[in-house]
Amino acid sequence: MPKSAVWGLCGHFNPAMPYSMQDLWNMGVKTDRDRLTKPYIRSNFLGDVFGVDTDEAVKTFLNTNDNYIYWFKPEFDTQMKVQEYFNALMAKQGGNLTENQQNIKNGLMYLHCEVLFVEDQKNPDLLHPRIALYQSHSYNELYDDQKEVMMRIHNDYFYHRHNEFWRASAMRKLPTLTGATNMLVCGEDLGMVPACVPDVMHELEILSLEIQRMPKDPNVEFAHPADAPYMSVCTTGTHDTSPLREWWEEDRETTQHFFNNQMGWWGEAPETMSAEIAEFIINQHMYSPAMWVILPLQDWLAIDENVRLADPKAERINIPSNPRHFWKYRMHLTVEELLSNDEFNKHVRNLTARRF
C-alpha cells in the first residue's frame, strides 16, 4: 500500500509483474492513463455514495467545472489527508464523529478507490489492476467491449500472470525456512489463492489451513471438518476472524443456513449462540481427519455459559479491514481461575478425547 492510502483496495502485490501503458494498449485498452488511475467521480452516482450528505460533501471536499465531472480538492486528494482531517475533527469534538460526518468520511475513502489501476510503488510508470475493479462505478460506465478487456486483464493479473513467477519465488525462499526447523509449518491458504500455491505446499509438506465458514470449494457455502485433508490444521477461526459467537450474530441469513444445513437442526436459528451449539460445532471438529485441530480459546470458552465472556464482540482479536484497529483482547479469566475450574476442564478433556 502507498503511504498515502488507508484502504487495502489501493494497494498491489509485491513482488509482482505490473503492466506498462503500452502493454495495456496492446491488450485492447482504448483510454489514457488518467482514466485508469485517477478517481472517477461523476455527479450521477454521488447521491448513491453520500445520500443526504451529498451537497455538504461536494461543497467541502470536491472541485468541478461543470457539475458533472468532479475531482478532489488538493487538501483532500489522498486517503491519508482525508483521515487526518477527520482525526482533527474528532479531537475537537471529544473523540467522536457525528453519523453524517462518518458517512462523508466513508464516502470520500470510497471515491479514492474509484480507479481501475494503481501505480506501482517502485516504478510509477507501471500499473496494477485494482482488486475487484468490476465493483466500481468507473468500470460500470465503460463501454461493453472495454469491460470485457478490463475483466480479461484483471483475471490474467490475479489468477494467471504470476503463477510461475510466484512459484519460482517461493521455491527460492520457502525450502530454507521450512528446513531451518523441525516444527511443522502451516500455510495461511485462505481467500484468493494463486493456482501455484497448493502444489508448492504439497511439495514442501506445508500444512493447509481449513476453516468451516471459509470453504475453498466455491460451490459450497460451508466446508465440513470431516472433509479436511490429513495434511492440514482444522480450526473454527483465527485471530483475523470473528470468534464463533460473534460470527453467529453477524449475518442472520448465513446463520440460518448453517443451523439448518450444516448442523442439520430444524426450525429457526436462535439469535445468539448457546453453549450447546458451540459444543456441537467443536465436536464436529474433533472428528476431523486433519492432523491438527487447533481452536481459538474464545471458542473453547463458548461451550460453558458460566465461563465465557458476556459480550461476544469483546472477544475479537483483530479486524483486518481496519488498519487502525488496536489489538487488545485478553482472556477475562486468570490462568489460576481457568486451571481451578474442574468442571470446565473435564468438559474440554471429554471433547478432546474424541480425537484419539
Write out the residue ranges for each language-model feature.
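Catalytic cores of glycan-processing enzymes that make or break glycosidic bonds
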Residues: 1-356
